[in-house]
Structure formats: C-alpha cells, structure tokens
Amino acid sequence: MAVENEGVLLVLSSPSGAGKTTILERLLERSTNLVRSVSMTTRKPRPGEINGKDYFFVTKKEFHELCEAGQMLEYARVFENFYGIPKSFIEQNLSSGISVLLSIDWQGAFHLFELMREKVISVFILPPSMEELRLRLQKRNSDSASEIEHRLAEAQKEMSKRDKYDYVVINDDIDKSVEEISSILDKERLKRSGV
C-alpha cells in the first residue's frame, strides 16, 4: 500500500513530434503538486533550451561517470546520444508528496516499470496519423529530410510498444489531451491514496 502523501511518477512517452512537450508544459501549468523531472543528455541543446531547466547538458564522458557511480535512475541511448534521470531528484520529490512528470522514451519507461512499477502511471501519446506526425516534424525546422524519415521509422517501432502502458492518448486536440491526462493523474492519485 502506498504512503498516503507519497507522490507518483507520471511517465509520458511518444514518438518525436506527437506533442509530448506541449502536453507536459500545460500539465505543469495546471498542477501545484507536480514537477517535471529534468533529464540529463549528451545531445546538443536546441534553440531556446536552457541547461538545468530543459535538460542537464553534459559530455558523454561526464554522463558515463555518473552512470558508473550509480547516480542515474535509468538511462538509454537514443539515436547517437544518451539520456538519463538523476536518481536523487525523483526520490526527494516522491517522499515529499510531490508527483514527478517524466518525459522519456519507451526504453526508459520499461526500465522504470521494472524498478518501481507500483509508483508509475504511464501514458503513451499517439499522433492522430503518420501524415500528421510528418507535418509536425517538418514544422519544427530542426531536422533534415533524412532525419525526419529516420524519426518516422523509429515512430513506428515506438508505437508498437504502446500496449505496455497504462493509458494511451491520441493527441488530435491538445486541450483535450491535456484534460484527459490531468484526469488520469487525479484518478490515480486518489486510487493510490486509499480514498
């Protein structure tokens, strides 16, 4: 049985371009008892991203040293870079009754399921169609045509994992998707508090 005031991990996964980041930002605006986990990555920052807010940007050497020291809850290689979740951030928030929102790929989610399934609420976000996903990726203007094709191929693989998640949300309307995931979080918090 979960401690009454213990937080939960809300895991959001999706193919690149499905709207996960926008949904994450809107969920954080709505809730005072929810924080975003800041992941660590070896990839280069995108325009407008801030170190310590969007990600902790580190070198591959620094990343591997932290992993070897056991300071990552989970980590995975995605394309040519590494992503990981610092362990202490999660533990401190959960024990304080604050839920943590994680935006991670399916590999990281599956690892968390193994480590702490009883604390995880998982949601896979789908685009309304592959054509819509292509359009969203093109609108970003951050990837070449070949990178977009690679992301679309990876999206097919990622979407095949959706049945392992607690919930699946089709993001064809951002406001409805945010409302649906917010309701899921409220329902799961109530269930886990024994109310």
Swiss-Prot record:
Q: Which UniProt keywords apply?
A: ATP-binding, Cytoplasm, Kinase, Nucleotide-binding, Transferase
Under the heading Pfam families, the entry gives: Guanylate_kin (PF00625)
Detail the disulphide connectivity of this chain as listed in its UniProt entry: none
Q: What is its main location?
A: cytoplasm
CDD domains (alphabetical): GMPK (cd00071)
Recorded catalytic activity of this chain's protein = GMP + ATP = GDP + ADP
Q: What does the UniProt function comment say about this protein? A: Essential for recycling GMP and indirectly, cGMP.
Q: What is this protein called?
A: Guanylate kinase
Source species, please? Wolbachia sp. subsp. Brugia malayi (strain TRS)
- The coding gene here is gmk
